[in-house]
A protein has these predicted regions:
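N-terminal beta1-alpha1-beta2 submodule of the flavodoxin-like/Rossmannoid cofactor-binding fold
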Residues: 1-87, 97, 104, 160-172
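Solvent-exposed loop/turn segments at secondary-structure junctions
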Residues: 11-13, 49-51, 94-98, 124-127, ...
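Short, conserved loop/helix-junction motifs that constitute active-site signature segments
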Residues: 82-83, 108-114, 137-139
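Charged helix-capping and loop-helix junction motifs
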Residues: 102-108
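Short, glycine-/small-residue-rich phosphate/pyrophosphate-handling segment
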Residues: 118-157
Length: 172
């Protein structure tokens, strides 16, 4: 099965394990790279043209403003032709109970009709939020599988859960 792992991740000050920590590599990026290694296929970083604030609280405010206004931030790089892709492992952090707005831009900009979308959401306790419902609404012609919630501060030990989830969905 030809698979694409697409992810949005943020470096900088993040809330993890009950405190603010400085992440040189975002939790979602680490989880996405593990999923991509297990599933094979291409790895694509969903990156906004603009950088999000390094400071956690400032980033939260920007993300709230984007969600409230329905912003669709421009992507720094477009994903290209996905016609040969059968499954998209979509990895993102939970922001404001859903996906960061660049992920919305990605989903709306790709033809995902008939493709399987496997959502994986990093968070510190909020789970998937309403992201799975949002993905179904944005991609009504795709098959959105049951997602996997990964605690960001425990991503280093999430390998077995990620592998089991990918096996359950027949990706590996």
């Amino acid at each position: 099965m030809k698979t694409l792992t697409a992810y949005f991740s943020r470096r900088g000050m993040n809330y993890a394990g009950g405190k603010l920590v400085d992440l040189k590599v975002g939790n979602t990026e680490r989880a996405a790279k593990l999923a991509s290694e297990l599933a094979g296929g291409a790895l694509f970083e969903i990156r906004a043209e603009h950088e999000y604030p390094y400071d956690y609280r400032e980033c939260v405010e920007v993300s709230k403003e984007e969600l409230t206004s329905g912003a669709r931030p421009e992507l720094a790089v477009e994903p290209g032709d996905l016609s040969g892709v059968e499954a998209v492992i979509l990895c993102y952090p939970c922001w404001c109970d859903t996906m960061p707005m660049p992920v919305w831009t990605f989903l709306e900009g790709c033809d995902l009709a008939g493709k399987r979308i496997l959502p994986m959401c990093t968070n510190e306790g909020s789970g998937m939020g309403r992201s799975e419902a949002d993905i179904r609404r944005l991609c009504p012609e795709a098959v959105v599988e049951k997602g996997l919630s990964v605690k960001g501060s425990a991503v280093e030990s999430a390998g077995p859960a990620i592998e089991a989830w990918l096996r359950e969905h027949g990706v590996i």
